[in-house]
A protein has these predicted regions:
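Beta-propeller domains
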Residues: 1-217, 229-438
Length: 438
């Protein structure tokens, strides 16, 4: 235990991948990314040179319009002098680089082709929780903050002192409510903090987000325009909401993954929350250090809609990358083939509207289980592309890469690539046409 004192666990870097600045970054929200050579997978130097003054959450998002990446991560203090100096240069105040409780959430902007993020801003959280995913629109970034929290300094100190794992310090506190943090991309300022309706929903992943004009209560508007007089913009946030809302039951499965049962109630359904923002007002006065100290505007959740109610319980959805931040019709999901399954093992396409249609559930035969879907576009149409998945074959103890037609998911397989080996269950992957140009 003494060897672990004052030493945070290393980041597993096992959740997602990002190609940036000619490097492959392996991500998990528990720390900075591992940096790899994308051609050889050799580990390269520390990511401190990127100047991100925080951890690096697993799901930064890329704006399809210009390739700008927006990411976030908890800031537990600068990890090195080099990181601290780069962060101050990017706009953070020195005070925001010191440890605090709860840890602030740092947002950063990284333009395509730049060697590191250009802007950063840290914001105080209402409670100490880790952030896994982020949603993006043309003008905002949104993160969901479920009340799965480290409750106090004492619990946090026990992790720092090596007395127990960080994951063992969290408690489900539904009375705190689930919040959505809305960040204005132009300034990286906190625009609003919205509480979602009780009982507090919980999720790991978002599906998408988009903006609409706020004409009046209950009316549809035009995507991506300013709010009407008397009301601000309306943001639609679509999330993978855990079906039974029992976060402790879900987390208990990770304690012994070999015996885990991710049954239907622990999987997700697609839910859209419509958030009404107040009319635009002059930005609050903040210090030049960029510590995100301004008070957020008062905003509200005006509607909750369950989408594609007939969809199979699912996780790890994917959409056409050109539709990130704007209204998408389809998502491709990793779902349970039937109610007897204890792990997601099939694929489905769902329509992201109330009462939306769903495709047939795509299965791959007895003893074969699909992994999460990855959409690879061939054109701008939402279903113009391929869906890739790794399929494990229990009889052969090997994994195949299976390629499906996104427009006809349950039709004939486009191609199957036998890998000749077993791949363990995976989370997320990426596709890049030319690794050398990123």
């Amino acid at each position: 235990m003494t060897a672990n004192a004052a030493r945070l666990p290393t980041n597993p870097s096992n959740t997602n991948l990002l190609l940036r600045d000619g490097k492959l970054l392996a991500l998990c929200e528990g720390g900075p990314p591992a940096v790899l050579d994308p051609l050889t997978l050799a580990t390269l130097k520390s990511s401190d040179t990127y100047g991100v003054a925080s951890f690096f959450a697993a799901h930064p998002r890329v704006d399809p319009a210009d390739g700008t990446l927006i990411g976030c991560g908890l800031s537990l203090g600068a990890t090195s002098l080099e990181s601290a100096l780069a962060s101050i240069e990017a706009g953070l105040s020195p005070a925001s680089l010191l440890p605090s409780f709860p840890a602030p959430l740092n947002f950063f902007e990284w333009r395509r082709g730049a060697p590191r993020p250009q802007r950063q801003r840290a914001h105080t959280l209402p409670f100490f929780t880790f952030v896994h995913d982020l949603a993006l629109t043309p003008t905002r970034a949104l993160v969901v903050l479920p009340p799965y929290v480290i409750p106090d300094v004492g619990a946090y100190a026990s992790a720092i002192l090596g007395q127990r794992a960080v994951g063992m310090c969290f408690e489900w506190r539904p009375e705190l409510g689930t919040r959505v943090m809305v960040i204005e991309r132009r300034t990286l300022e906190l625009e609003a903090l919205v509480r979602l309706p009780d009982p507090a929903p919980t999720c790991y992943h978002v599906i998408n987000a988009f903006e609409e004009r706020a004409e009046a209560e209950g009316t549809e508007g035009t995507e991506g325009t300013e709010g009407a007089e008397g009301g601000g913009d309306v943001l639609s946030l679509q999330i993978c909401e855990q079906a039974n809302g029992d976060r402790p039951m879900l987390e208990a499965q990770y304690m012994d993954i070999a015996q885990a049962a991710f049954v239907a109630e622990l999987q997700c359904k697609a839910v859209e929350y419509r958030l009404r923002l107040p009319p635009k007002s002059p930005p609050p006065s903040t210090s030049s250090g960029g510590d995100g100290a301004g008070e957020p505007a008062v905003a509200s959740c005006v509607e909750r809609v369950e989408l594609a109610a007939s969809a199979r319980p699912f996780e790890l959805p994917d959409v056409h990358p050109s539709y990130v931040g704007r209204r998408a019709r389809y998502a491709y999901t990793w779902c349970l083939a039937d109610d007897e399954s204890t792990f997601a093992n099939a694929l489905q396409r769902i329509e992201l509207v109330e009462g939306g249609e769903t495709s047939e559930v795509v299965t791959f035969g007895a003893g074969r289980a699909a992994g999460s879907p990855l959409f690879v576009p061939t054109d701008e149409g939402e279903d113009e592309g391929y869906v890739l998945t790794f399929v494990y074959d229990g009889a052969r103890h090997e994994t195949d890469l299976v390629i499906l037609d996104a427009a006809d998911l349950s039709g004939d397989t486009v191609a199957t690539v036998a890998l000749g080996q077993h791949l363990p269950p995976l989370f997320h992957g990426i596709w890049e046409d030319d690794v050398g140009t990123v």
